[in-house]
Amino acid sequence: MGTERKRKISLFDVMDDPSAPAKNAKTSGLPDGGINSLINKWNGKPYSQRYYDILEKRRTLPVWLQKEEFLKTLNNNQTLILVGETGSGKTTQIPQFVIDAVDAETSDKRRKWLVGCTQPRRVAAMSVSRRVAEEMDVTIGEEVGYSIRFEDCSSPRTVLKYLTDGMLLREAMADPLLERYKVIILDEAHERTLATDVLFGLLKEVLKNRPDLKLVVMSATLEAEKFQDYFSGAPLMKVPGRLHPVEIFYTQEPERDYLEAAIRTVVQIHMCEPPGDILVFLTGEEEIEDACRKINKEVGNLGDQVGPIKVVPLYSTLPPAMQQKIFDPAPEPVTEGGPPGRKIVVSTNIAETSLTIDGIVYVIDPGFAKQKVYNPRIRVESLLVSPISKASAHQRSGRAGRTRPGKCFRLYTEKSFNNDLQPQTYPEILRSNLANTVLTLKKLGIDDLVHFDFMDPPAPETLMRALEVLNYLGALDDDGNLTKTGEIMSEFPLDPQMAKMLIVSPEFNCSNEILSVSAMLSVPNCFIRPREAQKAADEAKARFGHIEGDHLTLLNVYHAFKQNNEDPNWCYENFINNRAMKSADNVRQQLVRIMSRFNLKMCSTDFNSRDYYINIRKAMLAGYFMQVAHLERTGHYLTVKDNQVVHLHPSNCLDHKPEWVIYNEYVLTSRNFIRTVTDIRGEWLVDVASHYYDLSNFPNCEAKRVIEKLYKKREREKEESKKNRK
């Protein structure tokens, strides 16, 4: 044997002359690569012309200039923190740099490996993966894929997967060391979502057990020093953005109605400012759709004196094809030499950092976003419209300077910016119900939650509440250990209450119906209520209405959808959201597969039986027994145990005010509403959830006195049945 030793090429080694292929590519117009650079190494097909066109644009991105430095740094370190301004190209390019390096290192081409890039939002995971598939000249779902809740668009051929942070957490439950992955990239880490924060702690442990795994943490803001400290002094790399100067304007006085002010500002910009697209930040779907209608109407009233506009909404539940419209060009002038056209994007804070839209010159920032808030004392989690942070305001204004100098109109005072806005967005883990998170951690084998390495540890009270809820649901025993029921619950991508409702539904002989209800609750609202046809929409909804509540109304809609062969025309005629129904059908099929895996029976009570709806309502109560409200003599509802005054949401389908209701959602607005409610009977509380309705630790209220009577009634019935048996 000879003594010559081959040098093992390490992951991310940079070639002796790394510029050589790039030079060749630039001079020959070929992509980076070796001899076969005309052939796409990922699918074996020749590159298309579009690939070369996109490649030229990719080379102009700031991150491209630091490719070698990035690969060298990552080669020498297990963890790397990368800060890149939005628009630097980090989300699309870094994962591609990584898969090329991993591919170069993997000599056995049959060995499967994967690079994962997490996104906090579904829209970003889908949109970015499509863009990267286009850049790599491959088919989405093949070499490049994405995975979001209830939708997996990947295959065994996938080498690069964009996925929501929540989906990577779910994968960790089945594969605690994430063995399939060679590199994991946590993108948009500055957003500090609940799932990202849990992944921080989890991956820190995984890295100790897997020296071959690499981690890249990417952020758009300079809170990176905190990430560095957390990841034991990992190196920090900064990529500049392509920011032009942005002029910032504040209002002189606080705006009473930010929506009207935003619309007014759009019209003024369109009338008075030079060409350039507009980005408006609003808080949610309803507000955005309302603004889009009003902008079209206001500009339409101006006639020929202004150019044409294209108003495009952007929010998470928008169909993917509609989401892609944000990348369409602005409309051409109506007549040659006439006023220029303008694109107006009206978006949630998803356009802050997750997606980059070229052509934006004007940004309108009302200073608000919807944020999750949680009060552990009364166990209420709700989405509230809240002021944004200074960091978010900075990100928003930066959207205006991507292609040329821009302007940002902040619809609040400079004093308010300086004095009222927090420096950073409060991490989600500090303002969320942690029941689902605790269940996930328990499934991952992490029992000591108090000492789990959270970057920002949640309040002990919030953790205690989560443990208490899971104990009542039977997911944890009295010692805090995961039960068999808890293990099954953790497999469902649902909140713990809904998972429990599904698991126990066979005991009530109604699992088919509970599957349909769960699927309907897991998708956007199926009822469409256009402003110009509200009366007709309300009449259509009333036809599906069930007098005993909203859950049963949703069941009626699902049954009618299936009976009408999932016909889109039927949906249109009945003011039903066809996409939501198709999603519900897809969700239901996935839930059926999980039920089958655990041998949970598919069954239904005979539709003609008087117990048909009773059994469904009892099964729902078995999951949602902690979300019950009682009608007091005063005419308002009190949440049971927490004694919060609440009102039935106006959208409910009940034709009466039941004494007891279960509710799906607690909505905090000017009044406290409970939404998606169903009538239940008081005695069921005693039958289905006696462990929770233990009167020894019950606050004094009317509901307690009623339940006391129900317990006494049950005792009498037991005594009588004993006597009868004798």
Curated annotation (Swiss-Prot):
Sequence motif DEAH box, location on chain: 187-190
Residue ranges annotated for the Helicase ATP-binding domain, each copy included: 71-240
Listed transmembrane segments: none
UniProt keywords, alphabetically: ATP-binding, Helicase, Hydrolase, mRNA processing, mRNA splicing, Nucleotide-binding, Spliceosome
Family affiliation: Belongs to the DEAD box helicase family. DEAH subfamily. PRP43 sub-subfamily.
Known function: May be involved in pre-mRNA splicing.
PANTHER family, per database record: ATP-DEPENDENT RNA HELICASE (PTHR18934), ATP-DEPENDENT RNA HELICASE DHX15 HOMOLOG (PTHR18934:SF109)
Stated name of the protein: Probable pre-mRNA-splicing factor ATP-dependent RNA helicase DEAH2
Organism of derivation: Arabidopsis thaliana (Mouse-ear cress)
